[in-house]
Amino acid sequence: EAQADSPSFLVAAFYAFTSLSPVALESLLTDLPELARREQVVGSVLLAPEGVNGTISGPDQGVTAMLECLRSRISLGDAHFERLQVKRSRCKSQAFRRFKARRKREIVSLGQPCADPRRNVGTYVDPCNWNELVDDPDTLVIDTRNSYEVAVGSFVGSLDPATDSFRDFPDWVEQHLRPL
């Protein structure tokens, strides 16, 4: 049972690159807002043919119901959404004003039709090995966040492509990394 001064709302952030059929996408766009209303959940869920990306907030049972809905209807190839690690935190008041489920062309806007994050992925780095990797002088770290976010803080020695949006990153790669 929650104490009176402890945060009472659960916040869940999640994403998955997986194929969503047009039927599954439309069904979720219809069903998620109704479920969110019923469960008093607010936030945003982006749905695209390449997957799902969202952050939601609400009572524990409401957030759990939303995640269960997604788990039951989204497959990650031979894995299931239930095996996806959802990042959870708590807050004292609702983190968002309303709930929106939206259709997008991409869940991460890159604007490159040949880029398919469901098929072309890098090497997974275990968190235990992260510091060793970024401290290696042969590792090139590029901070792909926008200029404002990089100004707040970045990894020591990382390259700042000075982009306004992640969508600008492919052009920067063509101009600066392809010649290497």
Tell where the protein language model's regions lie, with residue ranges.
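Cytosolic catalytic domains that perform sulfur/thiol-centered chemistry
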Residues: E1-L180
